């Protein structure tokens, strides 16, 4: 339907005035191409990048990663930092829990000499530091570990046992309103690590909830639920964890997909084993009995030996990684089935993760 000519002139004048006053791009038609392509940073796990749909975590947005203790939350964020640093990006880690291990971070590939780190005294201080870093426009990734440790100043200065109902939630709500716009303008990725608590008296449905109120749930573009689902053993020795990540909220692609990978103790995400699994799934790696082959060349009997072969032959690892990324990430935005890369998720699982 054609718009009246007088209305078109009035609209053009209004848009011109808005752009003159607030800057180019402050208002645009939704179909314009300027904001449609989301820039992302890899998580370090190919299957999780595919599950996220856009090929990684979106820049200029807020992301929440939550799960039980020792599920791999901090490890995953350190892998994101390592991925970003390999691309020459500047990263910051706000260590509210005062528990960051620099030696472990270094083992995961983090350049600790160029990682900005802060151990704030109060929750307000931590969030002000986040705001200052995002407004600078120089920092690409900020990680806050964790929301549960962001203690309001009034609570720190008060007595143990004093009631501070809703104080942390109000602090987070105010911070989200302030941070969201600044992150978009500076194209900074802000990741909040969060812990799980149990709602008391819940008889039906999921009793789990996250700390810090509801504001973070609403402002987060992506929410990831990370769980340890098993152990990786070498004989009787436990050397890692089988990990599942569910994308419970996603504003940049289809939600409710999931990815599974191994986190090896002291090493991080087992990208080699992940490539073997994805290679077999997508018929780039052949499996006959216990033997794995790539391009007609046998690379090992059993997954452990095939994984070690890839470690020892980086050129083969890079070739397989490139092929899988081209195959999977080119179609990641087309809302493919989660079964293509991680195993199917039941309807009940999806229902449990709804907010």
Swiss-Prot record:
One of its GO terms (cellular component) is cytosol. Its main location: cytoplasm. It comes from the Bacteria. ATP binds at residues 67-74. CDD domains: RecA. The keyword Nucleotide-binding applies. GO terms for molecular function: ATP binding; ATP hydrolysis activity; ATP-dependent DNA damage sensor activity; damaged DNA binding; single-stranded DNA binding. GO terms for biological process: DNA recombination; DNA repair; SOS response. The keyword DNA damage applies. InterPro entries: AAA+_ATPase (IPR003593), DNA_recomb/repair_RecA (IPR013765), DNA_recomb/repair_RecA_CS (IPR020584), P-loop_NTPase (IPR027417), RecA-like_C (IPR049261), RecA-like_N (IPR049428), RecA_ATP-bd (IPR020588), RecA_C_sf (IPR023400). Keywords: ATP-binding, Cytoplasm, DNA damage, DNA recombination, DNA repair, DNA-binding, Nucleotide-binding, SOS response. Pfam families: RecA, RecA_C. It is found in: Cytoplasm. Belongs to the RecA family. NCBIfam families: tigrfam_recA. Can catalyze the hydrolysis of ATP in the presence of single-stranded DNA, the ATP-dependent uptake of single-stranded DNA by duplex DNA, and the ATP-dependent hybridization of homologous single-stranded DNAs. It interacts with LexA causing its activation and leading to its autocatalytic cleavage. PANTHER family: MITOCHONDRIAL DNA REPAIR PROTEIN RECA HOMOLOG-RELATED, RECA. This is Protein RecA. It comes from Proteus mirabilis.
